Amino acid sequence: MAKAATQKETTTLDEGIETGIAGLTTDKIEAVFNRVINTETGGRLKVYVETCIHCGLCSEACHFYLSHDKDPFYSPVGKVKTTLWELLKHKGRIEPEAMRQIALTAYTECNLCKRCAMYCPFGIDIAYLILVVRRICHMLGITPQYLQDTAHSHSATMNQMWVKDDEWIDTLQWQEEEAQAEIPTLRIPLEKEGADIMYSVIGPEPKFQAQLIYQTAVIMNVAGINWTMPATPGWDNSDMAMYSGDNEIMGRLKRAHFDTAARLRVKKIVMGECGHAFRSVYDMGNRWLGWKMPPIPVVHAIEFYHDLLKNKKIKVAKKYEEGVTLHDPCNVVRGGGLHEKSRYVTKAICANFIEMLPNREHNYCCGAAGGVINCGPPYKNVRMDGNRVKAEQLFAAKSKGATTLLAPCHNCHSGLEDINHHYGLGLKIKFIGDILYEVMEKPE
């Protein structure tokens, strides 16, 4: 029977993890391990595990490893060695206490950014291996409390912020009224069947950032888009269950999202500036549901802005003058390939664009992704210490004249705000839509 792997001391006590561990036995861990490995994995896992030659090339790609002065425990292969390989080596017969560090490593020390996979000579997807560990942890009931609360919200309300149905509709009507002070004829169409576009957002927008809905409504109306938003559950495209390991809820969320679009008979879905939600429809939720492709086309806000500007449906009155640098979200760029379209949009609306180095698919993660920021305040310092290299990257861009950082992803936005304050960078952090709304031509 395996004991806890020797690693750094754990000082964070998480009620979600501690309560789960208290109810574990070695037999239960073994049973869950065998269920996941034998019924939910296959050749992909076997090939990855047996192909790795421990060359260490993945290490130099990892922001956690680089930010911790190349401590091998923070290397991607080190994280897999102390989690999944421990479980595989002992065929799941692990002491309950050993699961604490396994869970903390899987949930809080890997952003699932997949930068390491780009540098692996065999293309091993370590994020997938860590997700297998998270799946086992979820099945054992040892998920960080804050992240589990978000998954509970998804399960109960079909959104991640416990937003009630009437609160959602009230927020849309409120933002419509606010925007009508600027454009009297503006509408946010609800439940309009046959529209060209269903616009979907993530839970924090109606809860904390309603101005983003306002801005989108202005963009849609000025561009003359035939659009709608749903009034029923299915409006939230986010999916933190994807990161907690709750694949069943992940599947429910994706099905509800697409069922809502199908009910409204829209031609396509436009998603707001969110990275993980985008990944959930092109990489994970669709796979769990057995879909080769989404049943209704989905585009990210970056693609939507790109088409509006390229087709001159939105015109720029005057470009944003301050120095701007652009963060490339992992799930949008490394996973979604939207690096050139995001630059087209940025250059179209900003007069002084300063490239961050490295950039595009080689950019460093924000440190919030993969559900790590959703593990809550207890792990904020883990994120800050684990992403010093991102702060250095941002400081270098600032030294070249950047005063504004564009982050076209909600989790990135929040994670970069934390880095900005923690390291005293003094940058203004904006969504692309913030600046597009600011500089676009609007009716008099």
Regions found by a protein language model. Give the residues of each.
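Iron-sulfur-cluster electron-transfer modules
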Residues: G23, T39-V49, L84-R287
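Phosphate-coordination loops involved in phosphoryl transfer and adenosine-cofactor binding
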Residues: G194, Y320-E322, A402
